[in-house]
Amino acid sequence: MLEQLKEEVFQANLELPERGLIKYTWGNVSAVDREKGLFVIKPSGVGYDDMQASDMVVCDFEGNVIEGDLNPSSDMPTHAVLYKEFPEIGAVVHTHSTWATIWAQAGLDVPAMGTTHADTFYGTVPCARFLTQAEIDRGYEEETGLAIVETFRERGIKPMEVPGVLLHGHGPFPWAKDAK
């Protein structure tokens, strides 16, 4: 099921360590098949050197595993919320890249500082608010997605004009039209 999408997601995940964007297994890429209402995501805790395309996990937007022998990334509920609420996006990435994670700890938006920034982000990159203890207790990963959606809706930001966000105290969640 979704073999081509699994391969694309697998290859995109392999780029994370190659580009120095992750430590250990702390990062993931997913991509969606809108016609089927399913997405493919990296499995949880699997080393990038040990991973194969067949290890990718197929999930629905409700967070159910549809296919796969491994557990999906612990960030899967965040990805599911983003796919449900932002139908224009086709792939989501989450890393703990050093500089973006450091910036996210401050809880500050990333201001547009020049044309290079504007090549990808048409405005300030927002930092979604810190989650409350009640939200964390309800389910950190799903609440993360909801806080991101809240940030974009409250600020009137279009997800494909500003294709990413920081989460206060956590790190970056960028997205794109596909995983390539």
Residue ranges and their predicted role:
Residues 1-180:
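Glycine-rich flexible loops
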